[in-house]
Amino acid sequence: MSTQLTLSREDIVRLCERVEGAETRAYAIPKLTDEYPAMTVADGYAVQAELRRRFIAQAHKLIGWKAGLTSKAKMVQMGVNVPSIGFLTDRMARPENSAIKTSDLVHPRAECEVAFVTKADLKGPN
């Protein structure tokens, strides 16, 4: 996993805006690596951090973290060797047994991801 950033701050902001727009208006976008094939995992996490910052500025509440690509088969399919970590906000979570409008989704489907809702903030190095 590369810890080197290859994207400029401007690229990170622009890609974040693209992801945010797609999420807000529920439309599909091409993979970010289609435009930036040299994009590193660190770049991806930088885009995610900018998205998290924007959501929190819009009064989303950070409630936990989720892990994706947790199976070996999915990691191989996606060309990575470690799971990915993402954030979970109150606006992403749904109460148990609640209805979800499919019009709010791009490609409606169920996908198992491990998520952690924490009672207190996690603290530590990195």
Residue ranges and their predicted role:
Residues 2-126:
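Active-site microenvironments in enzyme catalytic cores
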